From Swiss-Prot:
It holds the Pfam family CTP_transf_like. Belongs to the bacterial CoaD family. The lineage of its organism: Bacteria, Bacillati, Bacillota, Clostridia, Eubacteriales. Homohexamer. This is Phosphopantetheine adenylyltransferase. ATP binds at S9, F10, H17, G88, L89, R90, E98, Y123, S124, Y125, L126, S127, S128, S129. It comes from the Bacteria. It is found in: Cytoplasm. The gene is coaD. Signal peptide: none annotated.
Amino acid sequence: MKTAVYPGSFDPITKGHLNIIKRASKVCDKLIVAVLVNPEKKGLFSVDERVEMIKRVTKKHSNVEVQCFSGLLIDFMKEKKSKVIIKGLRTMSDFEYEFKMALMNNKLDPNIETVFMMTNAKYSYLSSSSVKQVAMFGGCIKDLVPDEIIPDIKKKINHKKECI
């Protein structure tokens, strides 16, 4: 496998995302973490902030690049000359949604393959939305996100509570 693309919003990146990035980077020559620009969705972090945070937590992985994209993933794939999409799966509902997306992407470009990677069981409950919710109510996010970005989240949420 040469170049693979791992797309998502990553608002913010979680330890589950990072686990998929680490594992996927071992099975391809280059992994592009593709951060989706969705002007209709107001995220906690801007696209530039998300890209910077992901770069910060993946800097040890020399074959990982972080870029943003808008529009169809298939167009981004063509631009990057990649034929492989990496998707992490936590639950059966993730599979149902991602399976439909994989079929659509393959319909748009039959040369595109989607590789599903099972999330490590210890992260199967984890989502960016749940991280934001826990942080907004003052809960501890230390086990949910990479340590390097905890200050970014606290600053955005404007919450000073420390983990016990």
